Amino acid sequence: MQVLSVTPEIFPLIKTGGLADVTGALPVALAAKGVTMRTLIPGFPAVMEGFKKRKAVYQYPLLQGGKASIHAVQIAGLDLFVLDAPHLFDRPGGPYGNASGADWPDNWRRFAALSQAGADIAGGAISGYLPEIVHAHDWQSAMTLAYMRYGKAVGTPSMMTVHNLAFQGQFGAGIFGELGLPAVAMALDGVEYYGGVGFLKAGLQAAWAITTVSPTYAQEIRSPEFGMGLDGLINMRSSDLYGIVNGIDTAIWDPETDKHLVSNYTATTLKARAPNRAAVEERFGLDRDDSPIVCVISRLTWQKGMDILATVIDGIVATGARLAILGSGDAGLEGALLAAAARHRGRIGVVIGYDEGLSHTMQGGCDAIIIPSRFEPCGLTQLYGLRYGCVPVVARTGGLADTIIDANEAAMAAGVATGLQFAPNNGGAMLHAIRRLVDAYADPAAFETIQRQGMKADVSWDKSAEKYLELYRLLLSKRVA
C-alpha cells in the first residue's frame, strides 16, 4: 500500500512539537505492516542541509510567487519528498515565524504551496509514483485535500488528522484569488470560513476520513467548549470521525539504552534512577533530599494550564514536593515561574527554553510529571513518563484521560494504576493531586508498583499503526465501491 503523508514538520529534521514525533514515527511503524509511506515536507533550511545530492523529480516554473522543485530523498531512514521553494522556506527563525516569534505574514502562501505540491503528487505529477491514499496533518497541510477535491486527484481517498484544533489557519477572503482554486470552492462546503478562508476547515470538509489523536478528544471537539468554532462541521462529519492515540518511538525513548541518561535502568532496577535524580537536582539547583521531584516539560501557555500551575505553585511547595520546570512560551508565565523559583530557592528550579537531552534526563530522574492542560488532543510527555517510571499526574481531558489510569483505591487494589488524574481547569484539584502523589511517594512499595505498571504499558506505535492501517483499508474499500 502506497500512502503519501503531507506535513510541515517531521522528526528528526524539523520539530516544534509532538506533530513531528508522530509524522516521523508513523512511517516506520507502518512499514512493518507492509505500508510504504512517503512524506512531503517543506524545504526549510534545516531540511535542505540534511541532504547534499539533490535530484529534482518535479519542477515548477512558478509556484506561489517563485520557482520551486520537488526532490526525492532518503534521510534518517525516511522516504521524503522535499518541496524546495527558497522564496517561501529559506528564511531565518522557525518554520512558522521569524526569530522574534511573530508569524510570517505569508504563511497562507507558504502552506498553500505545500498543499498544491501534495495534490499534484496525488494527481500523478511524479513519474512512477501514485499514492493510493493521501494523509494530511494539521492546517499547514489541510489544503492538500481541497486541491485534490477540485483537481485531478478527486478520486483518491484522503485522511485529515487534527493534532490540535486550536490552530486552524484562518486568513482573509482577499487571498482566495491567489490560491488557484475554482470560484466554486469559495463556498460554505468548500474553503470559506466565517467570511474568510479556513485551511483546516477546508481539509475537514474535503477529507474522506477525519482522525484526531485520542478517542476522548474526538468526542470533546464535537462540543462548543472544545470545537473552536468547528464543532458544527465536525458533528456533521461525525460518522467519518475517529480517535487514535499516538504512540512513541520506544527505541528513542528507552530508559535501558537512552544515552541522555547518566544511569540506565529497567522496571526491575528502579534504584538505578538515583544518578539521574542527582543530575536533575544539580541542573535545577534543587535541595538534595528525599522529597519527590515533580517535573514540568511543556510549552508555557494557557492551553497547557501553566497559569493555573503558577497560581498554586506556593501550595505545591507546601506539600513538600520539589519542582523542576523546563519550557518556554508566554513571557508573563515565564516571569511568574522564575519569580516563584526565586521565592523558593532549592525547592523550585526553572530552565527557560527547550533541551531534548535534558527532557530525557528529567523523565529518567524525576519522580512524577505534572500535565495540567485545559485540553490535550493526545499528549506525548505522559507516555514518556510511563515509559520512564516518571509517574504522570494529569488533567482528566483528551488523550491524558485515555492513557493514564488513576491510582484510586480500586485501581491500586487491582494493581493497574499508572498515574493520577484530576479535574481540568481547577487549581484546587491540581493541588489535591500533588498531595495524593506525595502521600503515595511516602509508601515506597505502593509508589514503585505504580511506576512499574506504567513501564509495562504498551506505548509503542504498533497498536496505533494497526488502527491507521484499518482505516486506510476502509478508505480503499470505499474507493473500489
UniProtKB/Swiss-Prot annotation:
Main EC class the enzyme belongs to: transferase
Function, as annotated: Synthesizes alpha-1,4-glucan chains using ADP-glucose.
Pathway entry: Glycan biosynthesis; glycogen biosynthesis
Keyword annotations of the record: Glycogen biosynthesis, Glycosyltransferase, Transferase
Protein name according to UniProt: Glycogen synthase
Binding site for ADP-alpha-D-glucose: 15
Protein family membership: Belongs to the glycosyltransferase 1 family. Bacterial/plant glycogen synthase subfamily.
Cellular-component GO terms for this entry: cytosol
Catalyzed reactions per annotation: [(1->4)-alpha-D-glucosyl](n) + ADP-alpha-D-glucose = [(1->4)-alpha-D-glucosyl](n+1) + ADP + H(+)
GO molecular function: alpha-1,4-glucan glucosyltransferase (ADP-glucose donor) activity; alpha-1,4-glucan glucosyltransferase (UDP-glucose donor) activity
Transferase as UniProt keyword: yes
